[in-house]
Every structure is written in structure tokens, then in C-alpha cells.
Amino acid sequence: MKRRRQRETALQVLFQAEVARISGERAFARTMELFGLNTEDFAYAQELVDGVLAKVDRLDRIISRVSHEWRLERMANVDRNIIRLALYEVFFRDDIPINVAVNEALELARTFGTEDSRRFVNGILGKVVEEPEEYRPE
């Protein structure tokens, strides 16, 4: 399964978990069932979901540092989760080049976000990737 589809699925799972206030595991199972997908084909999506949820506090601190005028709670759920996914890949996945993580996030924003999502996501990620060491989580 292509990584783009895996990222789309991970985003859907993270969104569902946050909105429905359920565990990532339960949201993943629901998503697999809803779309008739085989969990074995979505191992990278599962890894992204698990990784983002395990490090969500660290990722959110980065987002908060960069988005001075936007509190996390004010951000659209989909935008917040796209940024979390991208930051997870930037800081915790050495096999994913930074430009790939950012470009994939922009595609997710174009597909799942609002008219302004792509610009918003690009602004946040752009600041981080300009100086990744400045924002690297502890």
C-alpha cells in the first residue's frame, strides 16, 4: 500500500479518535471495518497513529511554540492532526526526508482541509523546518 494512502488513513484515524474521544486502537479498528480494509496492509498507518499518540504532548508543544496567535484548541481538528503527523515524521522518522513529510502534509491539507488549510499547515511547518534544531523535541 502506498505511503500516501497510509498517511490519509492515519489522519482519518487520528481525527476520529480525537473527535469521538476514543483510543487510537479503537479508531483504527473502526476505520478498517468502515472501509473494509485489511489491517496488515496498513502497518505504516498504524505506526503513524501509535507514534503520534505516544508523542502528542511533545508535538503539541512544538505547534504551540510556532503558532503564537493560534491556540491548539482554536485550530481545525484536521489541520492540527495533519501538522502532528508531519512533525512526527520530521522528528521521529529518520527514513522520511523532511521535504517529503512537508509535501505529504500539504497534500493532506488540500484533500481533507478547508480552503485555508494548506496555507496554514505550510506556515507552521515552514517555520519548523527552517530551524529544526530550534524545535526538536526533548
UniProtKB/Swiss-Prot annotation:
UniProt keyword annotation of Transcription present: yes
One Pfam entry name: NusB
BP-aspect Gene Ontology terms: DNA-templated transcription termination; transcription antitermination
Stored InterPro entries: NusB-like_sf, NusB_fam, NusB_RsmB_TIM44
Key words of the record: RNA-binding, Transcription, Transcription antitermination, Transcription regulation
GO molecular function: RNA binding
Transcription regulation in keyword set: yes
GO CC annotations on file: cytosol
SUPFAM superfamilies membership: NusB-like
Spans through the membrane: none
Known role: Involved in transcription antitermination. Required for transcription of ribosomal RNA (rRNA) genes. Binds specifically to the boxA antiterminator sequence of the ribosomal RNA (rrn) operons.
Entry's family note: Belongs to the NusB family.
Protein name: Transcription antitermination protein NusB
Organism of this sequence: Desulforudis audaxviator (strain MP104C)
